[in-house]
């Protein structure tokens, strides 16, 4: 045996001893089993990975921005590159964002990446939840993961809101003031919430530090914990899978060498997996196949965010200028994912503001439209798996066309959010049509109820008729086959 061969054997023995030592303490064999876990080859399942990678990009770009951002409303003399503010006293938070944008190398690009990653994060979570809803992937035993996903959707919106409040320009300050008014409108505990989240009556010197703390620590930790819980539940329960058209044939028996055959959830392969058998998942092994797919998704997500950052500008704080308590921007609108809440605030009539007799608790339209109704919407979403409940565990996804009333409810809900979002842009709509908001708002109020109900009923009727026609066709075919026999 050559010296090189002896060294190779010694290295292998040393490696085995190290692995045995680590395995005895950390159970590495269970990790090796996970590497063979099956992931269905479904493109729509990758939306969850897009959300995960967007969160990673948000953390990385946020770390860069956090090194230069100053969470303070104290006035400082601006001495940066923007000529219009040269030598003026501006809030330190505003000055630091100008410094990041115009003076730090790649600062504008990183800020844009952070912005678009946030939008893509919210969008991918929303699309992921729509996919899960319409395919019934929330059913038993996956109700807990649906609740976790709902919480993630709410936290993603909260992270975005606290983020665009930080520059403390005129737009951000106005949006922050709206949030403060909504928080303090909550009966009994409003003032406490206002002090906890906004540092007291707005504007306050504690507002930006408080929101910054929530934005960079509280919400990211909560999102990270929920993502970890989401992934642990997913690994424990295994993926849902689309119904199979036929039995899936592998190339080796279960426990054999890895092949391109029917990979199952236990990390092995089976010679035949019956199409009705949902106890195993047929798909790609976590390593190396799914890992390679995930790597491609990551780089595509990174490329998409980078392309958006390179070509599309973001909120121009230099145009709005620093916070001016005596003024209000001509046009204030939230980001698209909060537009529906803004629309509800605009459509609610003033008579919905009232005081409850005897107890003297005041209920304002701000509370109803900006807090109560959005909370009700998220509450309904969270408990939906318990409304559409199944005693038996379901591991195959469903065809939305075969779920008449569930699909109808989903269509109606989407229409409700869309109409409410349009109401949030009633000023722009009025300008485009040449009419005032006094004309548009009553129409939108009626549409907010009529359109969702009408579209839901129409969807239900169409799907029911389609199902009846399919049953009639199958009955006719069976009758013809019986006659032939």
From Swiss-Prot:
Gene Ontology molecular functions: electron transfer activity; metal ion binding; oxidoreductase activity
Cofactor detail note: Binds 2 heme groups per subunit.
Quaternary structure and interacting proteins, as annotated: Probable multiprotein complex; a catalytic heterodimer of an alpha and beta chain is proposed to associate with additional subunits involved in membrane attachment and electron transfer.
Miscellaneous notes: Proposed to confer antimycin sensitivity to the respiratory nitrate reductase.
Keyword Cell wall biogenesis/degradation belongs to the record: no
PROSITE patterns assigned to the protein according to its UniProt record, in alphabetical order: CYTB_CTER, CYTB_NTER
Phylogenetic classification of the source organism: Archaea, Methanobacteriati, Methanobacteriota, Stenosarchaea group, Halobacteria
Family membership: Belongs to the cytochrome b family.
Subcellular location: Cell membrane
Cytoplasm found in the keyword field: no
Name assigned to this protein: Probable respiratory nitrate reductase subunit cytochrome b-561
Function: The respiratory membrane-bound nitrate reductase enzyme complex plays a role in generation of metabolic energy by using nitrate as a terminal electron acceptor during anaerobic conditions. Proposed membrane-embedded heme-iron subunit involved in a protonmotive Q-cycle mechanism-based electron transfer to the beta subunit.
Gene3D superfamilies the record matches: Cytochrome Bc1 Complex, Chain C (1.20.810.10)
Transmembrane annotation, as ranges: 45-65, 116-136, 146-166, 213-233, 292-312, 336-356, 367-387, 409-429, 433-453
Residues annotated to bind heme: 114, 128, 215, 230
Keywords recorded for this protein, A-Z: Cell membrane, Electron transport, Heme, Iron, Membrane, Metal-binding, Nitrate assimilation, Plasmid, Transmembrane, Transmembrane helix, Transport
GO biological-process terms attached to the record: nitrate assimilation; respiratory electron transport chain
Cellular component, GO annotation: plasma membrane
Cofactor dependence: heme
Organism, scientific name: Haloferax mediterranei (strain ATCC 33500 / DSM 1411 / JCM 8866 / NBRC 14739 / NCIMB 2177 / R-4)
Region annotation Disordered: where it falls in the sequence: 244-273
Membrane topology listed for this record: Multi-pass membrane protein
